[in-house]
Amino acid sequence: MISGLGDWIFLIAMPLYIFDITKSTIATGSMFIIQMLPRLLFGSIAGTFVDKRNKKWTLVIVDVVRAVALALLFFVPSGQLWAFLVIAFIQNLVGTLFIPAHRSLLVATISRERLVEANSITVVSDNFIRIIGPSIGGTLLGIAGVEIAIATDIFSYMISSVLLSLVAVKSSQQKQKGTETSLKQKWLEFWGNWWNGLKVVGTNHLYSTIFLMFSFTWLAQGMINVLFVPYVINEMGQTSVEFGWIESVQGIGGLIGGYLLLKLNKKVASFPLIISSLLANGGLALLQFNIPILFFVFIMNAFLGITDVISIVRLETLLQEQVPENYMGRIFGAYNTLMALTMLIGMSIASFLGEMMGTVMLLNISALLFFLTGIVGYRALKQNMKVSRHGKND
C-alpha cells in the first residue's frame, strides 16, 4: 500500500512531465511502452522464478532495487528523456517479480474460500491510495517539479521493504532447501516449470477464456493510458492539477466497487457481475470521451472505477480459485505477460496513430473494445464456468 502511494504519484507525474516538455504522443507513449517491455519479455519467466523462491523476501528485494534505480535519476541532468526511459526499464524489469510474488503470498497466507474477500480488501486499499496519490502527484508536479515525485516514490519503496520484511509467513512457504544440482539441471528445470505453466493455461478452457477477455480490456487500457493525457490537456483544456483530480475520482469509484463486491459476492454469481460491468465500462467510457466537461468527466470516471474493480477482481479471482497452488506464480506470470503484450500493442497504436487519427477517435475505439469483451465473453465464459462447476475442465 505504501509503495503504491509513491507509484501513483510518480505514474501521474511522469507522463504529464514528458508531454509537457515534448508535446508529443509518441514521446509520452514511449514511456508507457518502455514500462511494458519487461513484463512482456520476462513476465512468465518471473512467475517461474517466484514459484521457486521465498515470496516475502522476493518482494523486499524488489522494492529495494526499484528504489536504487529511481535514485539514479538525481544524477542525470533534467530534461534527458533517454535517462527516464532507461531507468523506467530497469525499474520495471525487477518489478515483473512483484505481481506473481504478491498473488502467491496472498494465497499462501489465507484460505481459498476467502480469496474474494481478501482481493476486495486489497482493491479497497489500492484505491484508497489511488484517491490521494494522483492529486498529490499532479499538484507536486505543478509546484515543485518531477523531482519531488521521484523522491516520494523512493521513500515509499524503502518503507514498504521494511514492512514486508516483518510479515509472518507459514513455514511451508519458506524457501525449501533441496539437493545440490548442476547449473544445467537448474536451467532445464527452470524452463521446464515455465513451459508447464503455459501448458496449463493453453489446455484449460476457463483459463483461456479469461485470458482472451483480459486481452481485449488491456488493449483498450493501453490506448487510454497514452491518450488520456493529451485528452485532458488539449481537448478539455485542463492542467496537471485537474488531471490528478480526475484520476483520484476513479480511485473513489474503486473504493465503492470494492465495497460493493464484498456485499454482492455471495448474492450475485460471477458471470452477470463480470459481463454487466464490462458492458458498463464501454458505455461510460464513450460518454466520458465525447463530453469534455470537467464535472461530467469526474462523474464518469467515478463510475468507471466501480465497474473496473468488479470486472477485474472477479476475473482474477476465478483464476485464483481454481489454479493449483504450485502453478499459481506461473499462471499469474503468464497473465502478466499477456497484460504487457496487449497493453504494448494498444500503446503503440495510440502513440503512432494519435496525431494522425485524432485523440477522441482512438479513445472511442478503446471504449468499443470493452463492449466487444462483454459480447465475446458472454457465451464462452458462461459455458466454461458451467463446465468448471461440474468438474469437466481439462
Located regions from the model:
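Substrate-agnostic recognition of the 12-TM MFS/MFS-like secondary transporter fold
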Residues: 1-11, 34-48, 54-67, 83-142, ...
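Helix-loop boundary and gating motifs at the non-cytosolic
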Residues: 1-38, 199, 203-250
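Transmembrane alpha-helix termini and helix-breaking/packing motifs in multi-pass membrane transporters
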Residues: 13-22, 72-75, 132-154, 234-235, ...
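MFS-fold secondary transporters
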Residues: 19, 72-73, 91, 164, ...
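Membrane-helix boundary and inter-helical linker elements of multi-pass secondary transporters
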Residues: 20, 51-52, 77, 108, ...
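C-terminal transmembrane bundle of multi-pass solute transporters/carriers
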Residues: 41-44, 58, 62, 82, ...
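Helix-loop junctions on the cytosolic side of multi-pass membrane transporters
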Residues: 104, 108, 150-183, 378-391
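Juxtamembrane intracellular "pre-TM" segments in multi-pass secondary transporters
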Residues: 170-211
